[in-house]
Amino acid sequence: MTQQAQITPLTVRRKFADPTLWHQTGQEVRLGCTTCPELRWCGGLSIQAPVFNCMDFCCGKPETCTRYICPSQRRYSTLVNEVGGFDLHPYRHRVTPVLALPDYVPCILDAGDLGGPLSLPAVAVSLYSVIDHRTGVAKYSSRQEMLKRFKIHPDARVILTATAKDRRVENFWHVLQPKKTAESLRKLRPSLITTPNFSMHADTVRHDNLVSMARIAFCFEGFAAAGLPVALHVNSRTPNDFARWTEYLIASPEINAIAYEMGTIGRSAPRRAWHAQQLVALTRNVRRHLTLVIRAGWSHLAELSSAFERVIMLDTTAHMKAKKRQSATRIGRRLTWKPAHTAAGETIDELLLHNVRVCRRATRELLSAQRASDLTIAAHKQHEVTTSTAVN
């Protein structure tokens, strides 16, 4: 796709998770998938839902449907050609390394009720808050202008996180100007930017998922080519999706960071655990040091930190609770919240900073406990090797 190419917008409505649509280990691939021409990219559906193939999810109204990318639509070939097909073409050029960042980074949702500048070493702000939704380029002409707008300290490092609701993510694709967008973001000098998390809905045709993956890779290439330090969002619905990202990472040896978002997976603990296991398998199969930038997934932080070289937690809770006038407190290892009333017109800076301190401490305790466990295991293994050598 060229810079001048027209990008077709999508209208995505909120959907709710259906466990019968989740891939199940040991479940046979649907019969209708075996003859599908897209099987080599998709891998087929292995789900409990009584479907012949993914086309059973088609709404049957191709003339009016604008929700997903479906072969029944007239615009289907246009949407697929925008990303050059379903292949994930390896990126073999240099990728700017991720700068030193703390393992806990709070997300600043907006500047409302903040006085600033916030005394924080690093913060994350939404990519879609700094992009003009009409032109596709940054709203701010300089880093200083952006920091002032979000009440951020001049010395703070900034992550641009591209996780958001579907409508904002899809609109970004609609206004994206690959070269101009990336160059305008480079002027803001972010310490890291994540690629958009184009959705992988479980209740739609797989073609929509395949295009989402290609869009993620397309955005990564544009950001990386502009010299931005970027984390690839490996959004996936099936084991085959994770396998394709693994192959892409192996074939793109310069990529040093990936991103993932657990908050939109749903409240199913087994499903969250499945995604965490897939991430662990991915980094082990890639066999090189990777940084993981993750949103949500607190309960799997220790497991992930044992597999990745570094884990950076992006947290929206501290600011969200401060906006609701709630203060963080610890009861044992459990994080709880209590009311924290403020006077009319009073800023929430101190409340936010307090919440950040408590959440940061909780995050680091999880990470340090896992590191201590890893060191103990390594010491035991070394002792066994030494003992075995001495006996021999």
Model-inferred region functions:
Residues 13-14, 30, 40, 67, ...:
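Arginine residue identity/basic-tract feature
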Residues 16-33, 37-187, 204:
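Non-catalytic, usually N-terminal nucleic-acid engagement modules in DNA/RNA processing proteins
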Residues 151-155, 162-312, 316-319:
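Eukaryote-skewed repeat-based solenoidal scaffolds used as protein-protein interaction platforms
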Residues 10, 21, 31, 39, ...:
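Generic detector of leucine side chains in alpha-helical contexts
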Residues 1-96, 298-299, 303-392:
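C-terminal accessory extensions appended to soluble enzyme cores
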